[in-house]
UniProtKB/Swiss-Prot annotation:
InterPro entries assigned to the protein according to its UniProt record, in alphabetical order: Bocavirus_NP1
Keywords associated with the record: Activator, Host nucleus, Transcription, Transcription regulation
Entry keyword annotation includes Transcription: yes
Keyword Transcription regulation included in the entry's annotation: yes
Name of this chain's protein: Non-structural protein NP-1
Segments of skewed composition (Polar residues): 58-67
A single Gene Ontology CC term: host cell nucleus
Originating gene: NP1
Length: 218
């Protein structure tokens, strides 16, 4: 065999390439990209699942925000000058007294229970506040001082409740009690359950009582 033919075969073999060399290249060939644009997470969760989860969280957040905003809106409506439909015995009795000047003096379960509640609120904003300021150190008080304040208010309220119970026990036929209790029962019978379910705050009760006392003095 001539040297020329040997060289030609060697060149052809190099152009064709070695089969083993091609097999070694195959594992390193890049894979074709998937047409889907949703990458697979390690846990098997796709981006669509992540979207659903984020959407649920966003929905819960919006619902929570709406629930929180309801009391705020209600407060703004009450302080914006609009008439508040909620009532308490003080307002009902004062309105009735204004239209019935011959009505008897205040008495009855609703009157006394509201009066004692007003006294407790008034004690917190006045007497107990002053006592706290006298006992506080860096705007703080210890347990002994707090216990003293609590027992002081308890003693006052206990006495008022005992007086009310004594009156109901020994004056069961009190005309004034029957009169004013019937007035408030008639009021409750003509109001909606939604209005009565709304709780009156201590500040509103105290403000109504002060207005009533001012009207009575005039």
């Amino acid at each position: 065999m001539s040297s020329g033919n040997t060289k030609d075969k060697h060149r052809a073999y190099k152009r064709k390439g070695s089969p083993g060399r091609d097999e070694r290249k195959r594992p390193w060939q890049p894979h074709h990209r998937s047409r889907s644009r949703s990458p697979i997470r390690r846990s098997g969760e796709t981006s669509s699942g992540s979207y659903r989860q984020e959407h649920q969280i966003s929905h819960l957040s919006s619902c929570t925000a709406s629930k929180i905003s309801d009391p705020v809106t209600k407060t703004k409506e009450n302080t914006s000058g609009k008439r508040d439909s909620r009532t308490n015995p003080y307002t009902v009795f004062s309105q009735h007294k204004a239209s019935h000047p011959d009505a008897p003096g205040w008495c009855g379960f609703y009157w006394h229970s509201t009066r004692i509640a007003r006294n407790g609120t008034n004690a917190i904003f006045n007497e107990m506040k002053q006592q706290f300021q006298q006992l506080q150190l860096d705007n703080k008080i210890g347990w002994d001082s707090a216990r003293e304040l609590l027992f002081s208010q308890k003693k006052s309220l206990d006495q008022q409740y005992r007086n009310m119970f004594w009156h109901f026990r020994n004056a069961s036929d009190c005309e004034r009690c029957n009169y004013w209790d019937n007035v408030y029962r008639m009021h409750l019978a003509h109001v909606s359950s939604q209005t009565e379910s709304e709780e009156i705050t201590d500040e509103e009760m105290l403000s109504a009582a002060e207005s009533m006392e001012t009207d009575a003095s005039n």
